[in-house]
Amino acid sequence: VMLGLLLVAGIGVAVLLGPYALRVEHVAAEPRTGFHSDYYLYVPTTLHRDERGNATLLVQPNNSGRTSDDIGAHRRDAWMTGFERKRIADELGVALLVPAFPRTARDWRTYTHALDRDVLTTRDRLLARLDLQLIAMIDDARARLRKDGTPVDARVLLQGFSASAMFANRFTALHPDRVRAATIGSPGGWPIAPVAKVGVDALPYPAGIADLSALTGTPFDAAAFARVPQYLYMGDADDNDSLDFNDGWDKPMSAEVDRLFGDTPLARWTHAEMLYAQAGANARFELVPGVGHDRKALQERSTAFFREVLATP
């Protein structure tokens, strides 16, 4: 009987995981190509094509929710993230890329999964400039698909929630020319402001974009950023605030954000919305009544936004 139950359970797992497991490609790190971590690429059976015949790539940054020096733990989490987002890729008819970036315990202050300031300054090649590593992954995935006869838009759909929303939001500010549209769910208490200062107060990265040139060698491209359709959303009962922790923010900078804009995610929300409007951003902000820090309750809003974007030439 026990053997029979195990067999049934095994078949159930195979049926559940099968459609994703059979189609997902595990791409190993390729430092010479510019990425030091693995990624997962899932291609649904049917791909939506734009008017130029290009398919689209949806990028979902990984977020393990914890530090670990075991890269296998981050890979397993990234694989499961892809499995959970498979339905979205199928619905939209887009390929799905999930990086397996590590978030190490040995260097816990470098909050890789949120693309924090330390990621732009560290000398550790595994963790450094994950924005550029992700671009290398995107271009590697595009080359693989092109080899199979599927040209892919250089601009991606980018979505995230919590830490991965911080990554998606900050990546969009760093590389707006590579983003077709972005959905940003509960971005850690403060989305990056697309301005250099508020009044006389400078807003360095990741509070704002004041020192992007010094950090990256490339100035903020305000015109390209303004062209990216963005949807920023949060439950009005969400009190998840990355500014309270030392891994993602330097204390003086988080204190400055608290002083200027309020000390809770909800208090800061309208300030962020106003700064995006003043910068001419094509950004829709939405507070969802009665919802806390709940990705699954809010995912359909992100999917619907992308559906709208894909339907627009």
Feature map (PLM): residue ranges:
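Short glycine-enriched nucleophile-adjacent loop
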Residues: 165-176
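Short amphipathic alpha-helices and their capping/turn segments at secondary-structure boundaries
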Residues: 40-50, 83-89, 212-231
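The feature captures the conserved acid-bearing segment of alpha/beta-hydrolase catalytic domains
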Residues: 181, 186-279
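Alpha/beta-hydrolase
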Residues: 59-61, 234, 288
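A domain-start/cap signature at the N-terminus of enzymes
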Residues: 5-57, 65, 69-71, 86, ...
